[in-house]
């Protein structure tokens, strides 16, 4: 634990709540003091959904500290089970409430042992006589109103609209036509036809019923952050329900007839996760692969037992889902793909990895003589269709003609050829990023410096994309996922000048200020740093604010995601002389662009204070790194000729030229910056 002004990854309980609120009909109870219960507000603000966040805070106050927490926690679990009837209730403490060192496992067991009281004030038994005397108000009946019997109720229009209409009791000896049409009260038929024993059984079923599943999040809140806790919680839930199905002997591990996949790791508050999920669905549909399950977003916990039926698992983000995929791999020998399809090269590598898994699965199915397998490409891919030979056909061929042992290998080669054709078609004719990277507009970005920072998945993928596909020099690539530092270094090795592994945003800001890149690609915090330093920033990773939860379709994965990234990269850089031309001809933002020049022209000679910073750079630790003047405790004087020459520099690079000249003057111990010093600084920098 540490006290921080701002954090990239939040505390562990935030990750637990993100996973629980992603599932359908799962409720989370957070055992926490006031101040830790901000998740509801945060999710309601960022995720533009209609449903309420299914999280309840069991507040730890002075009364709880005096009496103990068990009574309140058990009461909240029982109450939510009665009100919400969820499939699963997930209990989690926070790092603050964990200090109490309470036995929450015992709380869960106590809640499971306690029956659910539906009506705590019902102390009398419902008898048949009381049921017969129950009446319900009803509007006057028209002559053409149908008398609906219990048998026909399912077919009535009112039942289709889920209207709870009581049936009308017709006295013995009277027909339907003799029913009084102006009845104001009729007897309710809900309990009329039940015997006394059935009434008692119904009363017992109403007052007590089985509990929802209750799980205590198995997370060390002192040692893991938000992302690690989310990964662990998802694996815990999957393991719980698969183990439950194994104990009940209802776990079906038979593979689906056609290739299928589980997408693991799409969850709430993720960076463009909803859009990425749609793009992945389209990608797998083009490849002829069915979606078996998507977890946790929109998933049902009772469907988790179907996970082993898929041919393989796909983990788009390393931050969540990798532990679940590894568990399914160890338990059921299910292969998984963890290559993020971000950029043309990585997307092609991901598809080839999927192709390898599918062909391997087909070989295994043929060896074990399972059900006949077929693999058909849809027409949407514009590729020729192919059918895998059925197992019985292969056996007949091999028996009748021993020399035809290459039939299966030929079929596998055909599948690989089709996958390669799909990659080629998407890269050359569908995706716009390939030809754009060879256009003159993108070539103008070649050699420009950029800094990339974010989570391990997006930062590594973005670094490789910029270096390999767009020719941009990545001066520094970094991540705040310190637990995945080794993998990150391996991925970005050879694609950047230096690597930064830290979760301290001030270090990232200092590094950006020292490198002075042409653009930044990072999180919401890097956007703030870019605004202070007047450096454009493109957001490519969580944590982000509401503007990066767009309503429109903006994926970052797949071929459409590559188009979006190309637009983001190009629009993040300053477009050449645009700012300078706007300043010359009086554009809409010429006032801002000429701010430095206006300030310099107000005085013929300016004695800059030690803490002076150009406009747009606030008094922060990051901004202080921009100029070494403050650290050297020296004052620099600009001559009138030097100021006039500096004013001739285009506005969009004037601040950078000014800082470089001042650094050179400090190194050479020049007390006044003249025109000669400026040109000497330029030559030294060019060399």
UniProtKB/Swiss-Prot annotation:
- Source organism, top-level taxon: Eukaryota
What reaction is this protein's catalytic activity?
chlorophyllide a + oxidized 2[4Fe-4S]-[ferredoxin] + 2 ADP + 2 phosphate = protochlorophyllide a + reduced 2[4Fe-4S]-[ferredoxin] + 2 ATP + 2 H2O
Q: Its Gene Ontology biological processes? A: light-independent chlorophyll biosynthetic process; photosynthesis, dark reaction
Known InterPro entries for this protein? ChlB/BchB/BchZ, LI-POR_suB-like_C, Nase/OxRdtase_comp1, P-CP_red_C, Protochl_reductB
Tell me which GO cellular component terms the UniProt record holds: chloroplast
> Which molecular function terms from Gene Ontology are attached?
4 iron, 4 sulfur cluster binding; ATP binding; metal ion binding; oxidoreductase activity, acting on iron-sulfur proteins as donors; oxidoreductase activity, acting on the CH-CH group of donors, iron-sulfur protein as acceptor
Write out the entry's keywords from A to Z: 4Fe-4S, ATP-binding, Chlorophyll biosynthesis, Chloroplast, Iron, Iron-sulfur, Metal-binding, Nucleotide-binding, Oxidoreductase, Photosynthesis, Plastid
The active site consists of: 441 (proton donor)
| EC number(s) reported in the record | 1.3.7.7
Per its UniProt record, the required cofactor names are: [4Fe-4S] cluster
Say which family it is in.
Belongs to the ChlB/BchB/BchZ family.
Quaternary structure (record): Protochlorophyllide reductase is composed of three subunits; ChlL, ChlN and ChlB. Forms a heterotetramer of two ChlB and two ChlN subunits.
**What protein is this chain from?**
Light-independent protochlorophyllide reductase subunit B
Protein source organism: Chlamydomonas reinhardtii (Chlamydomonas smithii)
Query: What's the name of its gene?
Result: chlB
């Amino acid at each position: 634990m540490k006290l921080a002004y701002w954090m990239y990854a939040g505390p562990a309980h935030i990750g637990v709540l993100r996973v629980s609120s992603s599932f359908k009909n799962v409720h989370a109870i957070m055992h926490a003091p006031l101040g830790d219960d901000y998740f509801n507000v945060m999710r309601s603000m960022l995720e533009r959904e209609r449903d309420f966040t299914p999280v309840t805070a069991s507040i730890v106050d002075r009364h709880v500290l005096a009496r103990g927490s068990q009574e309140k926690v058990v009461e909240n679990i029982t109450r939510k089970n009665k009100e919400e009837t969820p499939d699963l209730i997930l209990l989690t403490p926070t790092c603050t409430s964990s200090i109490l060192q309470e036995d929450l496992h015992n709380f869960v067991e106590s809640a499971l042992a306690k029956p659910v009281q539906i009506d705590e004030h019902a102390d009398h038994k419902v008898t048949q006589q009381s049921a017969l005397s129950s009446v319900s108000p009803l509007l006057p009946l028209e002559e053409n109103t149908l008398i609906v019997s219990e048998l026909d109720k399912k077919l009535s229009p009112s039942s289709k609209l889920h209207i709870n209409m009581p049936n009308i009791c017709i006295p013995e000896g009277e027909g339907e036509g003799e029913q009084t049409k102006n009845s104001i009260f009729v007897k309710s038929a809900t309990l009329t036809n039940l015997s006394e024993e059935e009434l008692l059984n119904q009363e017992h079923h109403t007052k007590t019923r089985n509990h929802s599943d209750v799980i205590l999040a198995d997370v060390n809140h002192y040692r893991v952050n938000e992302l690690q806790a989310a990964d662990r919680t998802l694996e815990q839930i999957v393991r719980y329900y698969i183990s439950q199905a194994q104990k009940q002997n209802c776990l079906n591990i038979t593979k689906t007839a056609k290739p299928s996949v589980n997408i693991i790791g799409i969850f709430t508050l993720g960076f463009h996760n909803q859009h990425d999920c749609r793009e992945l669905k389209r990608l797998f549909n083009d490849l002829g692969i069915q979606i078996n399950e998507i977890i946790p977003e929109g998933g049902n916990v009772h469907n988790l037992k179907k996970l082993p039926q898929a041919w393989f698992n796909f983990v788009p983000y390393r931050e969540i889902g990798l532990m679940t995929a590894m568990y399914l791999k160890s338990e059921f020998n299910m292969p998984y793909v963890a290559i993020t399809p971000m950029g043309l090269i990585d997307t092609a590598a991901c598809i080839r990895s999927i192709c390898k898994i599918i062909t391997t699965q087909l070989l295994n199915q043929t060896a074990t003589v399972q059900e006949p397998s077929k693999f058909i490409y849809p027409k949407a891919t514009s590729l020729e269709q192919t059918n895998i030979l059925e197992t019985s056909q292969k056996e007949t061929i091999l028996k009748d003609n021993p020399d035809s042992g290459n039939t299966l290998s030929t079929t596998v080669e055909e599948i690989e050829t089709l996958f390669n054709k799909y990659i080629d078609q998407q890269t050359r004719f569908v995706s716009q990023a390939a030809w754009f990277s060879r256009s003159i507009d993108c070539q103008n970005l070649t050699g420009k410096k950029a800094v990339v920072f974010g989570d391990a998945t997006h930062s590594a993928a973005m670094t490789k994309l910029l270096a390999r596909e767009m020719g941009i020099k990545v001066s520094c690539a970094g991540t705040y996922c310190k637990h995945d530092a080794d993998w990150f270094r391996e991925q970005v090795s050879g694609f950047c000048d230096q690597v930064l592994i830290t979760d301290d945003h001030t270090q990232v800001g200092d590094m950006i200020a020292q490198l002075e890149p042409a653009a930044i690609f990072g999180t919401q915090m890097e956007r703030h740093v870019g605004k202070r330093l007047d450096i454009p920033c493109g957001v490519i990773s969580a944590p982000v604010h509401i503007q990066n939860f767009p309503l429109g379709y903006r994926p970052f994965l797949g071929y459409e995601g590559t188009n979006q990234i190309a637009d983001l990269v190009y629009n993040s850089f300053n477009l050449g002389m645009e700012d300078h031309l706007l300043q010359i001809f009086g554009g809409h933002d010429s006032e801002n662009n000429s701010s430095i020049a206006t300030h310099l022209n107000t005085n013929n000679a300016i004695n800059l204070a030690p803490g002076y910073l150009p406009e747009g750079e606030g008094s922060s630790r990051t901004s202080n790194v921009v100029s070494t003047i403050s650290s050297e405790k020296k004052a620099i004087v600009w001559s009138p000729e030097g100021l006039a020459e500096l004013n001739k520099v285009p506005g969009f690079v004037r601040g950078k030229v000014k800082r470089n000249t001042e650094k050179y003057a400090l190194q050479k111990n020049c007390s006044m910056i003249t025109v000669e010093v400026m040109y000497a600084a330029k030559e030294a920098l060019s060399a």
